[in-house]
Amino acid sequence: MIQNQIKEQSLKVKMCGMRRKEDIAYANEVKPDAIGYIFFSKSKRYVTGQQARELDQNLDQKILSVGVFVNEIIEKVTEIANEVPLDVIQLHGDEDVIYIEQLRQQTDKEIWKAVRVKDTKDIKEAQQLPVDKLLLDTFTEEKDMYGGTGKIMNYDLIPKEGIRKPFFIAGGLHSKNIKEITEKVHPYGIDISSGIETDGCKDLKKMKEIMQITGGRHE
């Protein structure tokens, strides 16, 4: 058992970038609160709706399935959300209020919005969005880079008075820094991908380690 567990037992854990049967088997073993499928074709963790549906058939029903979309047309988002089916739609691109409101009219699924944080203004504006939860991620100038950078966000940008909406943090998280970061910013949850991989593939040992550190549901 890893020492110095995070005391806050309610910290949610989302493990993103599932694309192999082994990934789902690992998730079923360690039991994070949610897993993510990435439907952005430029991502190295990209899966199709059909692939996600086949993977999701073997996922423990207690684990939420989250679909990550980047500037996708709304009809395609709802099509995949119903096909898999997904529990949550996560928007990770440049989707604005109008887009989100239109999506709301076409689905009853929970909607999360990722925000690439460059300054405090980004967070303040994100709190006004009609979404259920936020995901604060690292800002990058790289073209077509929407998350998955493995780089740590500047957590000093999070307002000291807190954030009104429940929020996940992402970007460069791994077993060596999660405890310190979560104790500093007190997020609703963490979203981790590269931090549970070895050579680009999900690593069961690292997944177990994260769940132990966060006091998660791993048994």
PLM region spans:
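Conserved N-terminal beta1-alpha1 strand-loop-helix module at the mouth
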Residues: 1-219
